[in-house]
Amino acid sequence: WEPLPSETQTIHFLNPTDPEGNIYDISLVLQKKKDSSPLATIKCNWFKTDGSGSWEYGVYDSISILNNRIYTNENIRKKGKRIEMTLKDRESQEEMTLSFTPQKDGTCKIQQKGAEELVYSKERTPITQVAAEPDFKQFFRQDSTYLQGYINGYDPRLGFDTGLIYLSNELTREDYPTVIQIAPNGSFSCRFIINHPIESSVVLGHNWIPFYIEPGQTLTMYIDWEAVMARSRARDHYFPIRNTAYMGPSASLSYLLKDFDNLITYRYEDLSKSQKTLTPDQYKEHMKPIIAQWKQVADSVSQIYQPSLKAVHLIKNKVDLQAGSMLFDFLMSRDYYAKQDSTNQALKVKEDDSYYSFLKDMPLNDVTVLANTNASTFINRFEYMDLFRKAYSDQSFSPSDSIDYTYPKKPLLTFLKEKGVKLNKEQEAIRLRQEKLAGTTAKIIMRQLIAENEKMASLYEKEQKLIQEYVALYSEKKEESQQDKDKIFIKMNQKYDFKKDSIIAQLYPTPNPLLWQIAKVRSLNFNLGNIKDSQIAHEYVDSIKQIFTEPFLASEAERVLEKTHPKDRARSYQLPDGKATEVFRNIIKNHSGKVLFVDFWATTCGPCRAGIEATADLRKKYKDHPEFQFIYITSQKDSPEKDYKK
């Protein structure tokens, strides 16, 4: 290799297609002595030492965090053993002064002007004190929330300046991912609206950093990028991201839920192996000691958090939902594996109804499960469990049963005879009887109807063309109105729901549990999409609302109805301010004045690609049209270049 130029002091390795591997600031010169500036002495996170584990201060290169707010570092100076910092609130622009007195043991005495001086530690101490807190009272309460924080070690050269929060309305299956804007100094913030407390995550690349927040709250997070990279280097999904800190009203619950997840891990490898080697009953036995261990851990943690009834409630729900989700997930993919390995005896064994007995111990009537990160998975598995297939099985008849049968005014056998078809004695006898009953409705024994069809089967098979002609000439089926079609659809759904209600009643002691009500709200988008008449749709929603015991479910049902059957169809949508809107407007700016068909898609999304193929003829029709344009938007992450070109 050629020697580097003598003036080169620093080198970087930056890969625009793989920012995770970026390396920068490799120094080729001898480093100066350790930074001994006043800021270097106090730059870190400072935690209370009273047993609460509370993060009170964060001091960094250009910003500081305290009072659940972000401040700009204005000035720092040393006065004897003390270090004084002047800070300016980033929002209100108000200034304040902090005083730091480092101690020999590594702790630090910190004082806000006019407040008591207290001792703080660089390390978060084990929790020994938990503030008393009542259980959830008003769980549903729509309000905005504000998430902010700092990524220590962030540099724009890492190749990203945004993060994501994958938010969802679990009541309606609506997803609304929210962008987190990251400033060059590593601070970040975003605001979003939620309907109830949630456990979610800040997503940076493939790394998910959890948090818990409630409507109306502000939560501040500290993320250590080196800890994120340690997990990435470990190539282990279960490797903990350390040093994360939280500040705000729900900080203690954020710590709790993050740490508790690491105590009740269940690796996918065990699930995958069990699906291929165990029968359903064997898997339930396999899971018993694992779930028992989770519950023991939950009991121990609950003892520490006992003063907070809300914390204890969240702990119990987390164990229950994880256990339930695993028992549901075991049943998935077994049919697929069975097709791959037709000799596997374990895969030939299907679950019986008793497998679902675990549901009686699940919090199906507890709306607070929606705060849990596993809520979406559990509800999805619950509402589509295989046991509900019974509701869709065709009604079977006994040969001795009788049904109402309407005879056509022109019997088929008479039509065939007039066309020159020869009938045998049995067929002629049937024809004469049908002539007498033509146009009437009468009771007929199933056994008799089956016997008659068997006697005419060979004739029907031979005279297919004449039968088609008969159907075209004499079919008396009248054209149904849209209202009739909608009513038939609703009646069919109500029949299935009634059967499912009966199945739920056998599995769970409380009738009409809340999660089953939520499942019915979640199905509204699809059902209302199949009901075209607005009046019928409103009547349908009114009938559904009668079963809801939680008022917020009724209001969400009304909102879905307004979306599918709006009173005012001439509506526009104002795009929210932010980087995403700027990018979108930049994409469409060259098509001003046109009607735009915009499709967001990914190479990994089967329905997306099917939708593109389904509109191929439409694109041909409007190709080069002066007033119409198709725009398809994807990303490098969702559609890698190699797959995109295919």
Residue ranges and their predicted role:
Residues 25, 583-587, 596-609:
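Extended hydrophobic secondary-structure segments
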Residues 625-642, 646:
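Thiol-based oxidoreductase modules, predominantly thioredoxin-like and allied folds used
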Residues 234-593:
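Oxidative protein folding and maturation machinery
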Residues 592, 600-620, 635, 639:
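Conserved redox-active cysteine motifs that mediate thiol-disulfide chemistry
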Residues 4, 18-19, 28, 33-38, ...:
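A non-transmembrane, solvent-exposed segment enriched in polar/low-complexity residues
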Residues 592-596, 626-629:
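Loop/turn elements at helix/coil->beta-strand transitions in domains of secreted/extracellular proteins
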Residues 1, 46, 55, 601-604, ...:
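Signature tryptophan residues that serve as conserved aromatic anchors
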Residues 1, 12, 16-56:
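Tryptophan-anchored aromatic micro-motifs
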